[in-house]
């Protein structure tokens, strides 16, 4: 294949040459990055199949060949200084393999294939843009043609549409509708008006109110079209209703979509459109796509030339790719023929093309290293030319070395190069091999696995090498929580970390960040600590008889992005199922644990802060109780410990409003569902204790990423995180209600029995007292008994009034206590006034806000919204308060009438006295007539 002609523009040629050099050095990733950054730059059109694409590809192939020669030239220099060696009677050796990282022919073909796909996608996107532009231009030309035919003044139509957009009043909609019906003289007139509405609604800068108000206008026009049988205008609106509705529906959020969806239900109910249009409106995305396809078919004369031009361009790119592949195949054939014609023991210094992957696979593996105790032999006859090359020490390879001694660099010469030592010294800057790998096509098993627990090779993540400096960036604190060396938990043995990982809080020399009376900032870690997660199977679980690492769980959940935290080690087991224990023992045992997502993330760095009960770092908290760590592990896993309320070390020394809110949780019973005041004296601090497996599982589940089984809500919290708790809460509440209903009849029976007993006792007492009393007393008593009988309404009529009143007061003695209990509720402290303050809550502003419908209507009618009501703001400013309780004769008086009028009060008092006099006169007259009758 001949070299294509370079561009005449020297600047463009320099750009192509420089880019070919950079891509040859840095690999195809650099080309991808350049294509993404320069996709809109016309100078880089050769990357997307432009005019000089073939010149760029040939230049790139030449640069890659030159890079291969430069990389292999230093490897041939030691062979020229060596004496000639006798040729063994063996088969001719294969030519020198290309250096690792140099693209082979297959890679070049794949790179060209990927480039072809990218260019094709880019051309398809450009084709779509040009087709859309061509269709829009054709539609605009059609509108201009209709405008010339009808001679309608569309500016007058716009003047009528503007009030509809601004206020959407009935008068504005009626004016727009009347103008449309008065100008709907012919089908072109109707198409022009409908097309104008479509252009206004589907414009890119149209806001939601504009679209919604104009759709209201269309709805009114459709209604009158059906009433007046205006078929031409109805047919014109049917053509444009799909893009109008679908564009407006897809451009807004869900709450605004409901307003538009109501119109669709109305249209479907009234039968304005046929079934095909209704189906397109019910699925807006599909309907909009069908409408665009209809436009392409309608304006095919404009669209076909654009599509044909792009198809030709894509076909030319495919042809160039096929020519490039055939050229590489021909060069490979020529190279193989040259190798068969000129067999030589040593490779030639000049290699024109990269080797095939098959040649790389045919090269024999490097010889195995001899034992270290054997002396270094002299150069054997079959020694390869690059055996004397000094080994390249790779960074990070020492991490996998399990031997205690240091390798002798002099012993590496006769041993031969390792699999990671075949890297040329002048490797390109983009080539970086962090781990030792074998050459292409060779699967060389390791002589001895670096880890005794893994026979298949080293794990993906290197060990920490007994140091946490590189991960955390600063030292950790002392093993004690509060800096006390003589604490009862400091004399216990360290956990077993299998000699690979050091204890996370051992061998420290600086004061702990959570100790002392002053808090220090948390650790500045680049990634979360791995010791908090589950342990790999080749390690033993640490003994949890050490003081726990302090945490602070009073934090918001982190950002739920997968990039924030590294993936978990592949050998680590999944976390424990997060099932939580309830102190009342009402855990839903029939519900299994939720599924856990395998790609969970590690705990957040902010979790390393201290809890408020972690020793004397806060001067107001008491010290941890002695011997808290003496429980065996199987006792610790049984659930929450029993808190001794008499322990003085658990009583907080600060006000209750300075304590964490979580300390209220033990005081609220599971069956409680109504407000009950809590006594601050009952609050106790949790005793210090090692974290249980359930607690660790809960923390792990809290910081794990969202999954299908555990979705998140809009604020980032787990959707069903408290499902088990709410389920247990509802069960306890239901059980309590059932018990209350079951115990209801028995309680009423006991009350009636006690009521009967008390009445019998009181009746016996009253009978005894009545015998010893005089007649006058009994008369007065009987008079009082008649009054009390009318008041008490007791069931028993055999006993006297005093006994009835006594028995009633005794049997009903529970009601005042209930009232007293309800009055003794502690009021909830106001949140606005702040905790511990006695100031009254602020008086809320009684004026109506802008979200009030009445406020909005008054603004539309010309009210400024700042002063009183009315155009001149002469009315009241504050809204009318709610009506107070009035007397019967005042309840029909209007708003603003003074109820404390002195004249009205005087008149009312006089009426009271007049009525009293009239009643007294009537009584006196009736008494006099009775007396006269008796005398007679």
From Swiss-Prot:
One of its GO terms (molecular function) is RNA binding. The keyword Cytoplasm applies. The modification Phosphotyrosine is found at residue 723. The keyword Acetylation applies. InterPro entries: CID_dom, DUF7819, ENTH_VHS, G_patch_dom, Surp, SWAP/Surp_sf. Residues 850-900 form the G-patch domain. SURP motif repeats lie at residues 15-57. It is found in: Cytoplasm; Cytoplasm, Perinuclear region; Endoplasmic reticulum. The modification N6-acetyllysine is found at residues 18, 888. This is Calcium homeostasis endoplasmic reticulum protein.
């Amino acid at each position: 294949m001949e070299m294509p002609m370079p561009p005449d523009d020297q600047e463009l040629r320099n750009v192509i040459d420089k880019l070919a050099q950079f891509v040859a050095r840095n690999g195809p990733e650099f080309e991808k990055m350049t294509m993404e950054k320069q996709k809109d730059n016309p100078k880089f059109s050769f990357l997307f199949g432009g005019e000089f694409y073939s010149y760029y590809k040939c230049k790139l192939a030449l640069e890659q060949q030159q890079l291969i020669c430069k990389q292999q030239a230093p490897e041939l220099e030691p062979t020229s200084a060596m004496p000639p060696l006798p040729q063994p009677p063996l088969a001719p050796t294969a030519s020198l393999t290309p250096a690792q990282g140099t693209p082979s022919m297959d890679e070049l073909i794949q790179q060209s294939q990927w480039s072809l796909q990218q260019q094709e996608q880019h051309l398809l996107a450009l084709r779509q843009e040009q087709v859309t532009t061509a269709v829009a231009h054709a539609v605009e030309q059609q509108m201009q043609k209709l405008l010339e035919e009808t001679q309608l003044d569309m500016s007058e139509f716009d003047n009528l549409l503007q009030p509809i957009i601004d206020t959407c009043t009935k008068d504005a909609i009626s004016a727009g509708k009347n103008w449309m019906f008065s100008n709907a003289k012919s089908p072109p007139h109707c198409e022009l008006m409908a097309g104008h509405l479509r252009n206004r609604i589907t414009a890119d800068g149209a806001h939601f109110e504009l679209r919604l108000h104009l759709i209201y206008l269309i709805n009114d026009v459709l209604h009158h079209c059906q009433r007046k049988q205006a078929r031409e205008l109805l047919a014109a609106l049917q053509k444009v209703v799909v893009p109008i509705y679908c564009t407006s529906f897809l451009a807004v959020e869900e709450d605004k979509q409901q307003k538009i969806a109501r119109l669709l239900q109305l249209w479907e109910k009234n039968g304005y459109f046929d079934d095909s249009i209704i189906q397109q409106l019910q699925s807006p995305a599909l309907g909009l796509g069908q409408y665009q396809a209809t436009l392409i078919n309608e304006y095919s004369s404009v669209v076909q030339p654009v599509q044909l031009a792009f198809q030709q361009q894509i076909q030319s790119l495919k042809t160039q790719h096929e020519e490039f592949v055939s050229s590489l195949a021909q060069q490979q054939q020529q190279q193989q023929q040259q190798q068969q014609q000129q067999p030589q023991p040593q490779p030639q210094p000049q290699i024109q093309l990269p080797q095939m992957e098959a040649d790389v696979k045919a090269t024999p593996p490097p010889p195995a290293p001899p034992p270290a105790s054997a002396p270094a032999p002299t150069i054997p006859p079959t020694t390869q030319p690059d055996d004397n090359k000094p080994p390249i020490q790779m960074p990070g390879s020492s991490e996998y070395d399990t031997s205690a001694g240091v390798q002798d660099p002099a012993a590496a010469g006769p041993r031969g190069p390792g699999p990671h030592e075949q890297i040329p010294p002048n490797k390109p800057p983009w080539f970086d091999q962090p781990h030792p790998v074998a050459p292409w096509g060779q699967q060389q098993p390791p002589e001895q696995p670096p880890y005794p627990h893994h026979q298949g090779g080293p794990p993906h993540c290197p060990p920490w090498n007994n140091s946490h400096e590189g991960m955390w960036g600063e030292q950790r604190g002392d093993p004690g929580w509060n800096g006390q060396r003589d604490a009862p938990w400091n004399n216990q043995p360290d956990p077993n970390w299998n000699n690979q990982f050091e204890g996370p809080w051992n061998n420290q020399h600086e004061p702990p960040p959570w100790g002392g009376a002053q808090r220090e900032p948390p650790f500045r870690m680049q990634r979360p600590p791995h010791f908090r997660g589950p342990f790999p199977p080749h390690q033993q679980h640490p003994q949890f008889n050490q003081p726990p690492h302090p945490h602070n769980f009073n934090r918001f959940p982190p950002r739920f992005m997968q990039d924030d935290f590294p993936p978990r080690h592949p050998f680590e087991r999944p976390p424990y199922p997060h099932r939580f224990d309830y102190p009342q023992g009402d855990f839903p045992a029939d519900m299994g644990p939720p599924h856990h997502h395998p790609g969970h993330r590690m705990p957040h760095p902010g979790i390393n802060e201290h809890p408020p009960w972690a020793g004397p770092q806060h001067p107001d908290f008491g010290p941890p109780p002695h011997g808290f760590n003496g429980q065996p592990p199987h006792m610790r896993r049984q659930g929450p410990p029993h808190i001794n309320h008499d322990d003085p070390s658990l009583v907080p020394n600060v006000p209750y409003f300075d304590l964490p809110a979580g300390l209220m949780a033990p005081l609220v019973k599971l069956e409680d569902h109504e407000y009950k005041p809590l006594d601050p004296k009952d609050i106790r601090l949790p005793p210090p204790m090692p974290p249980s497996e359930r607690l660790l599982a809960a923390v792990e589940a809290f910081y794990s990423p969202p999954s299908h089984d555990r979705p998140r809500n809009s604020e980032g919290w787990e959707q069903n995180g408290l499902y088990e708790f709410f389920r247990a809460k509802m069960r306890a509440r239901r059980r309590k209600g059932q018990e209350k209903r079951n115990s209801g009849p028995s309680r009423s029976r006991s009350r009636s029995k006690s009521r009967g007993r008390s009445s019998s006792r009181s009746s016996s007492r009253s009978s005894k007292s009545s015998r010893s009393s005089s007649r006058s007393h009994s008369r007065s008593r009987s008079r009082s008994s008649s009054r009390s009988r009318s008041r008490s309404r007791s069931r028993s009529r055999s006993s006297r009034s005093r006994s009835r009143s006594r028995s009633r007061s005794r049997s009903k003695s529970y009601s005042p206590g209930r009232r007293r209990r309800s009055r003794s509720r502690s009021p909830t402290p106001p949140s606005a006034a702040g905790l511990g303050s006695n100031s009254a809550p602020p008086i809320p502003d009684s004026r109506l806000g802008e979200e009030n419908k009445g406020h909005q209507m008054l603004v539309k009618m010309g009210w400024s919204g700042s002063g009183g009501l009315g155009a001149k703001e002469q009315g009241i400013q504050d809204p009318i308060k709610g009506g107070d309780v009035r007397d019967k004769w005042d309840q029909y008086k209007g708003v603003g009438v003074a109820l404390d009028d002195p004249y009205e009060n005087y008149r009312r008092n006089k009426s009271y006295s007049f009525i009293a006099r009239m009643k007294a006169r009537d009584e006196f007259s009736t008494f006099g007539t009775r007396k006269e009758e008796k005398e007679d």
